[in-house]
Amino acid sequence: METLFNGTLTVGGRDQETTGFAWWAGNARLINLSGKLLGAHVAHAGLIVFWAGAMNLFEVSHFVPEKPMYEQGLILLPHIASLGYGVGPGGEVIDTFPYFVSGVLHLISSAVLGFGGVYHSLIGPETLEESFPFFGYIWKDKNKMTSILGYHLIMLGCGAWLLVLKAMYFGGIYDTWAPGGGDVRIITNPTTNFATIFGYLLRSPFGGDGWICSVDNLEDIIGGHIWIGTLCIFGGIWHIYTTPWPWARRAFVWSGEAYLSYSLGAIATMGFIACCFSWFNNTAYPSEFYGPTGPEASQAQAFTFLVRDQRLGANVASAQGPTGLGKYLMRSPTGEIIFGGETMRFWDFRGPWCEPLRGPNGLDLNKLKNDIQPWQERRAAEYMTHAPLGSLNSVGGVATEINAVNFVSPRSWLATSHFVLGFFFFVGHLWHAGRARAAAAGFEKGIDRVDEPVLSMRPLD
């Protein structure tokens, strides 16, 4: 009887007996075939870039400029818009052609990568060591592995510097904090102070401290990319021209599966950080494109009702709510004037539509009575009804309507997907790290199934 796990099955000219891996182990069959593994990696990159290009064009073809991006389920166009392409004051889309160009460039790139993947998978040499020693490698060659690490670091550093160059010299990027409701601007004075940039790493991850996710200005973001880009480039050069120190040779497991586990752990970490950034941060992820954060929607609702009732004659400074606390305004634990009601839990929220109304001691009563601008009212009303909540009951006081339009915020998509995928990658990290350590310690690979009870049972069919 043939089963899915039939060890005699041959795929791509390789079977379990000759490689030590069954067909479902995927690229494990190519561990020692550097040429074929190169093909698999290039083809994989082609698939990724193809998705980016195709999805980009899909979003462009469905995009309605009159509606906010976050109301249209878009996740790629907001990223391009954040880079300052095709948008003007207030985040209004004034030109979709750059988005089309981005999609086409990715499609063309994916074709090149796809061709390279097919070539190296089917036509090119199985191993690179003999014909192209510079590109060849042996997994246990510690010096070669750290050199490859160096090349990767240099590429990452160049990527970080591309954002710096775009922000400082090639048109600027979108700043949600620009006066009047956001605009594209050139970052002329990025923060390069070491204590400021790396101080983010020392912050608590809780509440308003928010670790690195609390960054609220583009100067710090671009300055951080200058630091990271420079460190990656110099770190890459260091790893290319040096050999691992004795402690590193002893501490790490040096095998293909170990490197896979390290990579999966790094990607999982980045996934978790991206999850928090896309959910909480409204500077790197401007709310004009991604929709409001949860706290932002809650604060926007409190602000909207304050504006409405103040126009109707309510004394918003002294009105009491049903609990005896301030209905519209109250004091924070530190004495600041904050919005009242359930949104009190988000008292340390900061957003560009709200900050102009603050004074030295929180919200300024005089500004609330005399200085509220129409764009602030419009934006708050829009954000109030587009909270990134998947709940039928109210969260943070945000009114939810079960008969309303089925709105799912891009922040919900991005945060959830990055957390779930980050978790899967973390499990993969643990799995492959355990296997790599076991192999390095000399344990027998796999499980001996000779005495497995199921082997003596009658087939189901």
Swiss-Prot record:
Its record classes its membrane topology as:
Multi-pass membrane protein
Which residues get removed as pro-piece? 1-2
Q: Name one GO cellular component term.
A: chloroplast thylakoid membrane
Keywords, alphabetical: Acetylation, Chlorophyll, Chloroplast, Chromophore, Manganese, Membrane, Metal-binding, Phosphoprotein, Photosynthesis, Photosystem II, Plastid, Thylakoid, Transmembrane, Transmembrane helix
Q: How is the cofactor bound?
A: Binds multiple chlorophylls and provides some of the ligands for the Ca-4Mn-5O cluster of the oxygen-evolving complex. It may also provide a ligand for a Cl- that is required for oxygen evolution. PSII binds additional chlorophylls, carotenoids and specific lipids.
Instruction: Name the residues that span the membrane.
Output: 57-81, 122-143, 166-188, 243-263, 279-300, 435-459
- GO annotation, biological process: photosynthetic electron transport in photosystem II
> Where in the sequence is Phosphothreonine found?
3
**Is Zinc among this UniProt entry's keywords?**
no
UniProt binding sites for [CaMn4O5] cluster: 355
Q: Which family does it belong to?
A: Belongs to the PsbB/PsbC family. PsbC subfamily.
Q: How is the subunit organization of this protein annotated in UniProt? A: PSII is composed of 1 copy each of membrane proteins PsbA, PsbB, PsbC, PsbD, PsbE, PsbF, PsbH, PsbI, PsbJ, PsbK, PsbL, PsbM, PsbT, PsbX, PsbY, PsbZ, Psb30/Ycf12, at least 3 peripheral proteins of the oxygen-evolving complex and a large number of cofactors. It forms dimeric complexes.
State what this protein does: One of the components of the core complex of photosystem II (PSII). It binds chlorophyll and helps catalyze the primary light-induced photochemical processes of PSII. PSII is a light-driven water:plastoquinone oxidoreductase, using light energy to abstract electrons from H(2)O, generating O(2) and a proton gradient subsequently used for ATP formation.
Name it.
Photosystem II CP43 reaction center protein
